[in-house]
Amino acid sequence: INRGNISKIFGELITIIENDKRGTEVTLAYSGEQFNVPSNVYIIGTMNTADQSLTHIDAALKRRFSSIEVMPDSSILKKGMKGLPELLDKINEKVREKISRDNQIGHSYFMQDGKPITEIRDLQFVFATDIIPLLRDYFYDSDDDLKEVLGEQFIDWNEGSDRNVKEDWQNNPETFRTAIKEAYHVTI
């Protein structure tokens, strides 16, 4: 709901979606038409609290909606490969320390087709294509913070390098396992 101007999107509807106005006929100010929102209609939206570039939602608008916070849940990953829940927890612990709890990585990154990842190659792919790019975005102006969250094993940190992702761990499952263990103290 913070991707657009909610007042403009909902228009006059915003005043009649409150619980005490549901099912009551009202005359719309601009068109003069009668309108109501039935009590059994639910408007469900999501809001990304981590993205500061999006539209701010004011208190008057927020009170018209119930909020349910959805945080990463590593327990969902227990049926996946060994160490997967612990890996998510360790990464998020570092993210919380460096940025905020709103920037934690969700458990869905470690799932495929609604199920936790079970194969090392799939986890390598997710790390290369999702986790590292996301962390780079979070820490675009601080190599030191990125290194603290990601460790030294996944990116070439050598002086004068372009900070490219190393290929050795992407192509070798054992090298990847070792990198995870060194960076996060988790055995996968």
Question: For the regions a protein language model found, what residue spans apply to each?
Answer:
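C-terminal regulatory/interaction module of P-loop NTP-utilizing enzymes
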Residues: 1-188
